[in-house]
Swiss-Prot record:
Protein name (record): Bifunctional protein FolD 2
Pathway(s) of this molecule: One-carbon metabolism; tetrahydrofolate interconversion
Residues that bind NADP(+): 165-167, 190, 231
Gene Ontology terms describing biological process: L-histidine biosynthetic process; methionine biosynthetic process; purine nucleotide biosynthetic process; tetrahydrofolate interconversion
Cited InterPro entries: Aminoacid_DH-like_N_sf, NAD(P)-bd_dom_sf, THF_DH/CycHdrlase, THF_DH/CycHdrlase_cat_dom, THF_DH/CycHdrlase_CS, THF_DH/CycHdrlase_NAD-bd_dom
GO molecular function, one term: methenyltetrahydrofolate cyclohydrolase activity
């Protein structure tokens, strides 16, 4: 058996095509979606991620504003910038590129972002809303994974999904989205004593642990659909290359479909960042239109 390779680049292109269409509709209504990107320091990987996000925003017709702060910037300075962007009605989405320098409290600054502009979906209001099934901005990577699963499998109702990893960025929101899609969901993690056995029962496996090639064919049920979120850089015969959390070569002999690394989940993350930005712009415009006009009372 040779697995179908899920093309994340092609799927992301389709999402971005719809985003461009939605942006054009908003612009016709006088609304120009805008995304503010904040980068603290000069981490090489973060520089690449920010550059790619700004490039995709431009391609989608979304205005981008890049804010760079030195690595030694104080937390107060970062919070002041976030407050300024929160108050700016021309900014619809705020993205804070992670990781942050060690002296900055990541949770504190993420919670300072207006939930309506939190296009990463990390604010506690959006996290809580997701767990309750409300219509909120959801984390981009899990949203992209769910989209790939629905394109590949169709209706996910009744399928047994195992999420490997319990991070706030991927594992937990992924489990919540799969529950909303009516899957039976199991989350395994570093303290699970029977992770491999549980995965062997799964129709869907989402791997997000950050350990290169941890999941091989022995973890998988024949015919399972595998979404590999991991991005790990390894040395292979003297050369550096990217691999996922799944041993791709062995998994393709058992799985019915699998995402590659690179070219699988990564492009979907950026595509759904753009989708979230357009959603935020639309919702903010609707909220502004719904506000009652001020009534001026003259005194005689």
């Amino acid at each position: 058996m040779s697995a179908h390779i899920i093309d994340g680049k092609a799927a992301a292109a389709r999402v971005l095509q719809q985003v461009r269409h939605d942006v054009n509709i908003l612009k016709a209504e006088g609304i120009e979606p805008a995304l503010a990107v904040i980068l603290v320091g000069n981490d090489a990987a973060s520089e690449v991620y920010v550059r790619n996000k700004i490039l995709r925003a431009g391609e989608a017709g979304i205005r981008s504003l890049e804010h760079r702060l030195p690595a030694d910037s104080s937390q107060a300075r970062l919070l002041a910038l976030i407050a300024e962007l929160n108050a700016d009605n021309t900014v619809n989405g705020i993205l804070l590129q992670l990781p942050l320098p060690a002296h900055i409290d990541e949770n504190r600054v993420l919670q300072a972002i207006d939930p309506d502009k939190d296009v990463d979906g990390f604010h506690s209001e959006n996290v809580g809303g997701l767990s309750q099934g409300r219509n909120v901005l959801t984390p981009c990577t899990p949203s992209g994974c769910l989209h790939l699963l629905e394109e590949t499998c169709g209706d996910l109702s009744g399928k047994h999904a195992v999420v490997i990893g319990r991070s706030n960025i991927v594992g937990k929101p992924m489990a919540a989205l799969l529950l909303q899609a009516h899957c039976s969901v199991t989350v395994v993690h570093s303290r699970s004593t029977d992770a491999r056995a549980l995965c062997q029962l799964a129709d869907i496996v989402v791997a997000a642990v950050g350990r290169p090639r941890l999941i091989d064919a022995s973890w998988l049920k024949r015919g399972a659909v595998v979404i590999d979120v991991g991005i790990n850089r390894i040395e292979d015969h003297g050369r550096s290359r990217l691999v996922g959390d799944v041993d791709f070569a062995s998994a393709t002999e058992v799985a019915s479909a699998i995402t590659p690394v690179p070219g699988g989940v990564g492009p979907m993350t950026i595509a759904f960042l753009m989708k979230n930005t357009v959603t935020a712009a639309r919702q903010q415009a609707h909220a502004q239109r719904s506000q009652p006009e001020a009534v001026c009372l003259s005194t005689y």
